[in-house]
Every structure is written in structure tokens, then in C-alpha cells.
């Protein structure tokens, strides 16, 4: 069991779709550090997906840094969003 994870494929699309099929995983496909920060702050994403064919090494390092250094905001609207996502998982 892990707190966070990082997955990579060619575009990041397929791996993010697959990761989001796993109960409890909230995987965000990010192509820049701003997206990584926002997916952590707003969606409490616990997995980061990136596309190796889409982004270079330096950009990838910036994305990973933003993802790992950002905490969930705990804002009410964001908590409500996470609760709705959890309900969708239970409905499967």
C-alpha cells in the first residue's frame, strides 16, 4: 500500500484510464506543473500519469516535484467532490 504513485506510458492517456479503474485511485494526467499542483489541491489525486512521448525529462521532473510537494486543500467543495467520486466507486 502506498500514499502516491506515478505511472508513465506513451501519451499517459491509456495508463491513466487503467489506473482510475482501481478502487481508491484518483489518477491525474498532467502535462505541466500547474496541472500537477491543481490535481493534488482540488482532486486529492494520489497517482500521477505522464506521457513519455509528450513531455521531456526536465518538464517531467517539474511535474513530479509539483505533484509530490502539493497537499490537498481540504476545501469544502473539494471534499464534496472527493465524496462524490467515492460514491461513484461504490456504485460499481
Question: Predicted segments — roles?
Answer:
Residues 1-4:
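Short alpha-helical segments enriched in small residues
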Residues 7-53:
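Mid-chain, well-packed structural core segment of small domains
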Residues 33-92:
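C-terminal binding/interaction regions
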Amino acid at each position: 500500500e502506498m500514499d502516491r504513485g506515478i505511472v508513465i506510458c506513451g501519451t499517459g492517456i491509456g495508463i491513466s484510464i487503467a489506473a482510475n479503474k482501481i478502487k481508491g485511485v484518483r489518477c491525474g494526467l498532467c502535462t505541466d506543473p500547474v496541472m500537477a499542483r491543481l490535481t493534488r489541491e482540488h482532486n486529492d489525486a494520489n497517482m500521477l500519469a505522464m506521457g513519455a512521448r509528450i513531455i521531456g525529462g526536465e518538464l517531467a521532473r517539474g511535474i513530479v516535484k509539483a505533484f509530490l510537494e502539493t497537499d490537498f486543500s481540504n476545501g469544502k467543495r473539494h471534499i464534496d467532490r472527493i465524496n462524490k467520486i467515492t460514491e461513484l466507486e461504490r456504485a460499481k
